[in-house]
């Protein structure tokens, strides 16, 4: 049998991954998302590795909004958008996201992975170029692979290399600079002001995946374009509803009106995927309403992140510099990252060791993510646990 060969090869691969400390085990939760969660086996732990930046994953207002919408609009749409899958609430959310992000128009997707996967191929042909930061999210990388445009990469946040790439692609019809707004593994922000200056100088478009920023970065949570004051200079923003904005799933692309209209006509993930579920649409609309009322949650996550980062640096941990809710503790060796995460779980702190291929080889880390749901007591407990395990492992 043909599968016999594949089976033995895969079993050998899994054995190698386990020996190298690269095999990923999924921990099973027994509670809803929150600052404190239950883990199968009866253990409770503080959760410091969720994308739950605003603490809205289990918020009663958000849950009720999802239930109310579902009671009227139903569980699913059973269709794609252009057949019979566009409800009034989908247009409401598109309009609300356009207003929130300061863009002309918005198109919804089942996930931001689909938003990125469906952007480049319809927009850029063989006579165009896409210029990408080397640490961009996998969804950008995969989306770029689907298009026929010339591909250029620049070293992470290196503006000199970006300018070289712009010069090299001067004869291309269109040039699109694409970058994460907040880089998910390092927690630093793209230099959007400098990127926009270069884009203006060389007549290029700018695209930002703001998934790890929308909702809490910027004065009112509008993301990295707001933080850098360049919203009107950004051509395309992709983002998710699966992180700060409630944490379920779904995403969108916002941007120039004509680009969004092209995506409605040609973007394959949009044309051939079911419409976003009504419950997610309703919950996301509620989140946007809540954010328009108050900056309290945004201010809280910033306060928590600043305090945690300061205390961990003071304790002697190797922290990647940054000023977002993502705080990477660098451990470099994959087995060490996995071991430390397991030891912290025994102390009541849920974190994950990130290893290759999620991060480059030799760059293993524990990525701590702060939330508005965390209390000062939660932070102090977790800092104390890190210090204890850090001393036991000889890290501090």
Model-inferred region functions:
Residues 11-73, 204:
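N-terminal "arm"/small-domain region of PLP-dependent enzymes with the aminotransferase-like
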Residues 245-312, 317-320:
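PLP-dependent aminotransferase class I/II
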Residues 52, 152-208:
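Active-site phosphate-binding strand-loop segment of PLP-dependent enzymes
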Residues 119-138:
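Conserved PLP-anchoring active-site segment centered on the Schiff-base-forming lysine
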Residues 299-308, 313-348, 358, 362-363, ...:
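Conserved PLP-binding catalytic core of the aspartate aminotransferase-like
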Residues 60, 64-68, 72, 95, ...:
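PLP-dependent enzyme catalytic core of the Aspartate aminotransferase-like
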Residues 80-86, 94-118:
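Short loop-beta-helix segment that forms the pyridoxal 5′-phosphate
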Residues 220, 226-262:
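Active-site PLP attachment segment
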């Amino acid at each position: 049998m043909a599968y016999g060969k594949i089976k033995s090869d895969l079993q050998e691969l899994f054995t190698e991954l386990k020996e190298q400390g690269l095999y990923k085990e999924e921990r099973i939760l027994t509670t809803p998302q929150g600052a404190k969660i239950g883990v199968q086996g009866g253990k409770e732990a503080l959760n410091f590795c969720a994308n739950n930046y605003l603490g809205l994953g289990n918020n009663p207002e958000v849950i009720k909004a999802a239930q109310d919408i579902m009671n009227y609009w139903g569980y699913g749409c059973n269709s794609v958008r252009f057949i019979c899958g566009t409800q009034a609430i989908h247009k409401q959310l598109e309009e609300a996201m356009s207003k929130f992000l300061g863009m002309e128009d918005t198109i919804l997707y089942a996930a931001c992975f689909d938003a990125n996967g469906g952007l480049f191929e319809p927009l850029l042909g063989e006579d165009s170029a896409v210029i990408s930061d080397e640490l961009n999210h996998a969804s950008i990388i995969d989306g770029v692979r689907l298009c026929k445009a010339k591909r250029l990469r620049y070293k992470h946040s290196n503006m000199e290399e970006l300018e070289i790439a712009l010069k090299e692609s001067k004869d291309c019809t269109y040039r699109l600079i694409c970058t994460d707004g907040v880089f998910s593994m390092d927690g630093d922000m793209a230099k959007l002001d400098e990127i926009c200056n270069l884009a203006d100088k060389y007549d290029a478009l700018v695209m930002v995946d703001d998934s790890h920023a929308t909702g809490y970065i910027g004065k009112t949570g509008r993301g990295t374009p707001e933080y850098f004051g360049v919203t009107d200079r950004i051509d395309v923003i992709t983002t998710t509803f699966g992180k700060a904005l409630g944490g379920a799933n779904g995403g969108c692309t916002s941007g120039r009106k004509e680009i969004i209209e092209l995506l409605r006509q040609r973007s394959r993930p949009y044309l051939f995927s079911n419409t976003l579920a009504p419950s997610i649409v309703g919950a996301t609309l509620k989140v946007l309403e809540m954010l328009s009322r108050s900056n309290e949650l945004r201010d809280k996550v910033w306060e928590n992140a600043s305090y945690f980062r300061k205390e961990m640096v003071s304790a002697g941990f190797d922290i990647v510099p940054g000023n977002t809710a993502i705080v990477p503790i660098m451990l470099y060796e994959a087995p060490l990252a996995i071991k430390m995460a397991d030891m912290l779980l025994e102390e009541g702190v849920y974190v994950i060791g990130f290893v290759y291929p999620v991060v480059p080889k030799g760059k293993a880390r524990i990525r701590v993510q702060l939330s508005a749901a965390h209390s000062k007591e939660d932070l102090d407990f977790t800092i104390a646990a890190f210090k204890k395990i850090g001393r036991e492992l000889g890290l501090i």
